[in-house]
């Protein structure tokens, strides 16, 4: 099963390999316009919901995988020499595929995963069915270093990159203040 997983990851079809989207759901998720095409889409969507609980691929992927797109194809899969374990990394759309981790566990995999989304300020560790989620919003680099497990922080360089960002912002703010003071001196608004 590990070899199959590694091959699917390399193809960028890991989730589809183990938690496949039914063919009937591979339809447009949205609006085709007026007329017969739209009516046919609506009828197929309704039939899909009745049969699968989802109207289309998008709803299924988000519901069953936890993300809208499949994962893999990063060329980052390493199979352990004993063939019983693999290590990989991948990007996913919007969120980690938590629902997929749960389903993979049901299929017999042991899943341990770490994730980080800097733009949305969250990180976490998923292991043995437990999602340790960390909301990083409003935290500075020191707080992040204290709050996150060391392994998670180091895997993504979270507190380190935040510290660099904070230092850059401090330099820019200091320069902006100095420029403002100099400008105010030139205008006679501040005495020397």
Please name every model-derived segment:
Residues 1-192:
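Intrinsic low-complexity, intrinsically disordered or marginally ordered coil/linker segments
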């Amino acid at each position: 099963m590990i070899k199959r997983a590694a091959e699917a990851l390399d193809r960028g079809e890991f989730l589809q390999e183990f938690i496949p989207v039914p063919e009937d759901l591979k339809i447009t998720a949205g609006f085709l316009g007026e007329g017969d095409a739209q009516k046919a889409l609506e009828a197929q969507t309704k039939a899909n919901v009745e049969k699968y609980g989802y109207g289309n691929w998008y709803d299924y992927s988000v519901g069953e995988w936890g993300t809208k797109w499949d994962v893999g194809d990063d060329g980052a899969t390493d199979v352990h020499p004993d063939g019983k374990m693999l290590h990989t990394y991948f990007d996913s759309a919007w969120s980690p595929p938590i629902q997929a981790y749960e389903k993979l566990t049901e299929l017999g995999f042991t899943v341990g995963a770490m994730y980080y989304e800097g733009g949305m300020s969250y990180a976490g560790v998923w292991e043995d069915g437990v999602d340790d989620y960390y909301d990083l919003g409003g935290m500075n680099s020191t707080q992040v270093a204290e709050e996150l497990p060391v392994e998670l922080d180091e895997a993504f360089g979270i507190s380190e990159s935040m510290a660099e960002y904070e230092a850059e912002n401090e330099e820019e703010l200091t320069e902006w203040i100095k420029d403002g003071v100099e400008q105010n001196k030139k205008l006679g608004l501040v005495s020397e």
